[in-house]
Structure formats: structure tokens, C-alpha cells
Amino acid sequence: MTTETIEATREGTLWREAPPYFDDLEIGDSMESSGRTVTEYDVVSFAALTGDWHPQHADAAWAKESPFGRRIAHGMLVLSYALGLLPIDPRVVLALRSIDGAVLKRPVGLGDTIRVRARLADKRVLGAETGLVTLAVRIVNQADELVARMEIVVLWRRQTEAAEAPPSGDELSPLQDGRLLA
């Protein structure tokens, strides 16, 4: 997916025009992704990577007799795609901190297309350079039916002199030694 395909809006403007820093964000801001169609290749690759060869995902004959009547994508694949579909800029979104309250509401089958809608639910300053942003994420299919929801917390860069200037030798950035100091 290219930047041009992202359809993320914030009060009528595209978030891709300039990355919003933490202090620019407001509770209630929202974004929506473009669509992503789940394919046979996606499901088989995910099964190979994770070792999850449950017949609901991998065996067409078995899945046909299941309550879903067809093969479906792994729930974790759907949630992973949702994270990847979020139109957020890596210059300001530094890390995923947590995934909370993930609920899978209906199956996503091969050939289904998912989209992500996210709303900024909360934010708090973590330090001079970063803050934590909570996004309420809803994943919908091509019929606009809710397939999953979750809340994610991400580490977001603040636009401050401390964030713009590299740390001096004696200062520790919250990310400098590879772990988040909070």
C-alpha cells in the first residue's frame, strides 16, 4: 500500500499531509484506513509462520462442515492486519505499547475485505519526548459489519526541543537503552 492510498481524515484533512505530534492530537480525532482483502496466500503464510494449522483455517473440507461453513482467517492475522492498516506515521508513532480488550465478533473469510476505523480515546504525557495514545480500533468487513475491536496504546513522539535535539551523552532518552522508561 502506498501513502497515496491511505484515506485518513482528521477534521477534513489527510493525516498523511504532515505527521501530527502528540500535542497536536485531540480526544475524538479519528482515522479510517483503505481496504485489505484477505487471501489464501495470507492465511497459509500466517499458518506457516505461527504453526497454527487449525483445520478451520487450513482444511477446506473440514471448514465446509464447520459452523462457519468455510475457511476463515486466523483472528490474530485479522488483528495484525488492522495494526498494519492504521494510517499512522512512523516518524511520530514509535512503538506499540499494548493491545487491550481484543474481541473477535464475526469471522473473516478468504476473499473478505477489512477496513479499520480508529478513534483517539485517551492520551497522557509520558515524558518530555513522548506520550501514550490510546486508540479505540474497530475492524469492519466489506458489508460494514463489525468483525473485531480492540484498544491499542502506542508511544507517540512529542514536538519539543528535547524531542528534536539528539540527547547529549549524559542524558537517557526513554528509548535510548532499548526499553521504555515510565
Predicted regions and their residues:
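A structural preference for long, well-packed, hydrophobic secondary-structure segments
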Residues: 95, 101-106, 148, 152-156, ...
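Short intrinsically disordered coil segments
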Residues: 134-135, 151-154, 166-174
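Hydrophobic beta-sheet segments that form the core/acyl-binding groove
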Residues: 98-142
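Hydrophobic beta-strand core residues of beta-sandwich domains
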Residues: 22-25, 38, 72, 102, ...
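Short peripheral tails and domain-boundary helices/loops at the edges of structured domains
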Residues: 4, 109, 135-158
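Intrinsic-disorder/low-complexity, polar/charged segments enriched in Ser/Thr/Lys/Arg/Asp/Glu/Gln
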Residues: 20, 26-33, 113-115, 132-134, ...
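Hot-dog-fold acyl-thioester-processing enzymes
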Residues: 2-97, 159-182
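A short acidic/small-residue loop/turn micro-motif
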Residues: 39, 122-123, 154-156
